[in-house]
From Swiss-Prot:
Domain spans labelled KH: 558-617
Entry protein name: Polyribonucleotide nucleotidyltransferase
Chemical reaction(s) catalysed: RNA(n+1) + phosphate = RNA(n) + a ribonucleoside 5'-diphosphate
The organism's taxonomic lineage, starting at the top: Bacteria, Pseudomonadati, Pseudomonadota, Betaproteobacteria, Burkholderiales
Family membership: Belongs to the polyribonucleotide nucleotidyltransferase family.
Length: 719
């Protein structure tokens, strides 16, 4: 019934099993990947024909996590998985990026790659098994694909590279780098690091590429035993006559368009050229008595012609599209404190790319609780990236963030994360929002720069500025050029784009996408060195605008006071059914967070109210000391004395003989319920019962004359 084929290989400290032939047999390709209790099923299906008029490659990659993989039932009302989580979206992008360049040019059939996570070991992230599974499923499917690819995670612990570290090992690692590629070339890198040098980062890329050959070889073995016949697919023959006609009609106009330095004017000119060429081709066909050529085909020829013009200009040493040389960063403008009510804000403009980044400070209650498959955790730092269509002068949909926005936000977050102060040094929750108001390339790196400035403007004590720069590379016939601070057009027309973010000390985030083979380690070294030069230039501009974090928080940011109490006193602060803490927060307008170790954080925009809440908590939790004097209140009268409250929840007996320096016949003659009195604690027995005295501090007659001894002041243990 089943023709099951299995391949096993050792991959770092883990054993990996590839299986096919038992599950999802009607898919074009299906592979089950198991890595020590983490199990993923990768499937691929391709349409046999491209849709009519299709002018791009419609690849869809969906990475899907099921809660049963972790032995859990989904939360919420519906009890089934809903929209993709951020982790699912990011992993889908991670898998898509190295696969997409390996499909042949002109292949426009629908291809859908779906990866289901079926079982999860909390110590082994499913993303690397998912990438290997997707590669293997494509390799055995027979679909036109210039793979397979391998993928590896690289850590850096105690000065050594670690292949596929566990989640536990990553906590002590200075690097979390994912690299994917073929036998001969690296195609994709995604990394975060704790200010590591370019040499260490590149070493991690090379190490990962060397180690992934084991996975690639195992996939080749699987293909030999279980591969389906290759598709009989050939790209459509090139219409040389049409190419020549389009080139002749468009060359002059395109050359003129790429002499225009301003983006909007250049785009307008290009649209005019495209429209004129389409009209000319239709007219020529009509004169020849032939049908008009396919408009998609004409547009593709024009795009190729654009690419040749731009690439040849750069490789020949001519100015780039906007007139710069290969190493120059666009002009930078920085404005701080743009929004008067925001806690921190920065408007970062680099050429025609602009980001308005806003920092908001919150309390522990504002932390994001993430119910991840590998375990629930709280996130105190959020970065949300938004790019509305007006940023590129277009119309479009506004609503739920797209995959690209989620990916760019995650990259910027990775870049800033290593510079955040420790929670014990800065207890605020931090949310950054990057609103891209203009875009012509490198908007994610503008978000990094703006985010660093906005946090410093808000008074977040970050250790240093973080800057990011997007780089490009053009390689042709052995000649190459590395481009600093690329434009959007250079991104589309180049062979590699990579984004590097970091401080003067080192790199904090690296993202690399390579569209061709043949980019060597030496070329990457040159590119990273040039990126460092650009990053340091930007850091200099940022320091000129703001040397370091502001020492004062915004007047609109919550103020936090921290006190430490005996953990056994927590119940006194909370009260029965939460009544005490609820009354405290409502009456003072504060937020109060209580940790199990007795640490209490009080937050309020009004510092006076925060201090009032602090005073009341200190009173609630203070220990009564023998010999101390307290301002109390008479709770009730007895024949032989009175019960007096000295602190909230603590009262004692004031005997009639300890009230005055004379004999009192009737207690009602000197005290009333609710009367404030100053008392001294003269005794506390082993059960905590208190004996009080007014006579010991001069008697009731002194208090009535206004010459009583002052009461003790409770000192809060503020941190």
């Amino acid at each position: 019934m089943f023709n099951k084929v299995t391949k096993t290989f050792q991959y770092g400290q883990h054993s990996v099993v590839l299986e096919t032939g038992e599950m999802a047999r009607q898919a074009s390709g299906a592979v089950l990947v198991s890595v020590e209790d983490t199990v993923v099923l990768a499937t691929v299906v391709a349409a046999k024909k491209a849709k009519a008029g299709q002018d791009f490659f419609p690849l869809t990659v969906d990475y899907i996590e099921k809660t049963y993989a972790a032995g859990r039932i989904p939360g919420g009302f519906f009890k089934r998985e809903g929209k993709p989580s951020e982790k699912e979206t990011l992993t889908s992008r991670l898998i898509d990026r190295p696969l997409r360049p390996l499909f042949p040019e002109g292949f426009y059939n629908d291809v859908q790659v779906v990866i289901h996570t079926l079982s999860v070991n909390p110590d082994i992230d499913p993303d690397i098994p998912a990438m290997i599974g997707a590669s293997a499923a494509l390799a055995i499917s027979g679909i036109p694909f210039n793979g397979p690819i391998g993928a590896a995670r690289v850590g850096y612990v105690d000065g050594q590279y670690v292949l596929n570290p566990t989640a536990t090992q990553l906590k002590s690692s200075k690097m979390d780098l994912v690299v994917a590629g073929t036998e001969n070339a690296v195609l994709m890198v995604e990394s975060e690091a704790k200010q590591l040098s370019e040499e260490i980062m590149l070493g991690g890329v090379v190490f990962g590429h060397e180690q992934m050959q084991t996975a690639i070889n195992a996939i080749h073995d699987l293909v030999r035993d279980a591969g389906k016949p290759d598709w009989d697919w050939q790209p459509a023959p090139k219409n040389e006559a049409l190419i020549a006609a389009v080139s002749a009609a468009a060359q002059e106009g395109l050359n003129a368009a790429y002499q225009i330095r301003e983006k909007q004017a250049r785009t307008t000119k290009l649209r005019e050229v495209y429209a004129a060429v389409q009209a000319a081709m239709a007219e020529q066909a009509a004169q020849a008595g032939q049908p008009a050529p396919d408009s998609v085909g004409v547009d593709n020829i024009l795009f190729d012609l654009e690419a040749r013009i731009v690439r040849s200009q750069i490789l020949n040493g001519e100015p780039r599209i906007d007139g710069r040389d290969t190493r120059t960063v666009r002009p930078i403008s920085i404005r701080l404190g743009v929004l008067p009510r925001a806690h921190g804000s920065a408007l970062f403009t680099r050429g025609e790319t602009q980001a308005l980044v806003v920092a908001t400070l919150g309390t522990k209650q504002d932390e994001q609780i993430i119910d991840a498959l590998m375990g629930e955790y709280r996130d105190r730092f959020m970065l949300h990236y938004n790019m509305p269509p007006f940023a590129t002068g277009e119309t479009g949909r506004i609503g739920v963030p797209k995959r690209r926005e989620i990916g760019h936000g995650r990259l910027a977050k990775r870049a800033l994360l290593p510079l955040l102060p420790a929670p014990e040094d800065f207890q605020y929750t931090i949310r950054l929002v990057s609103e891209i108001t203009e875009s012509n390339g490198s908007s994610s790196m503008a978000s990094v720069c703006g985010g660093s400035l906005a946090m410093m403007d808000a008074g977040v004590p970050t250790n240093d500025h973080v800057a990011g720069v997007a780089m490009g590379l053009i390689l042709d016939s052995g000649k190459f050029a590395v481009l600093t601070d690329i434009l959007g057009d250079e991104d589309h027309l180049g062979d590699m784009d990579f984004k590097v973010a970091g401080t003067e000390t080192g790199i904090t985030a690296l993202q690399m996408d390579i569209k061709i083979q043949g980019i060597t380690k030496e070329i990457m070294q040159v590119a990273l060195a040039q990126a460092r030069e650009g990053r340091l230039h930007i850091l200099g501009k940022m320091r000129d605008a703001l040397e370091g974090s502001r020492t004062e928080l915004s007047a609109f940011a919550p103020r936090m006071l921290t006190i430490k109490i005996n953990p056994e006193k927590i119940r006194d602060v909370i009260g029965k059914g939460g009544a005490t803490i609820r009354a405290l927060t409502e009456e003072t307008g504060t937020q109060i967070d209580i940790s199990d170790d007795g640490t209490i954080v009080i937050a309020s925009v009004d510092e006076t109210q925060a201090k009032e809440a602090q005073r009341r908590i200190v009173e609630l939790t203070a220990d009564v000391e023998v010999g101390q004097i307290y301002d109390g209140s008479v709770l009730r009268l007895l024949d032989f004395g009175a019960i007096v409250q000295v602190l909230p929840g603590r009262d004692g007996l004031l005997h009639i003989s300890e009230i005055a320096n004379y004999r009192i016949a009737n207690i009602n003659d000197v005290l009333k319920v609710g009367q404030p009195v100053r008392v001294k604690v003269i005794e506390a027995d082993d059960k905590g019962r208190l004996r009080l005295s007014i006579k010991a501090i001069g008697g009731i007659e002194q208090q009535q004359s206004g010459t009583a001894e002052p009461a003790a002041q409770s000192e809060p243990q503020a941190e």
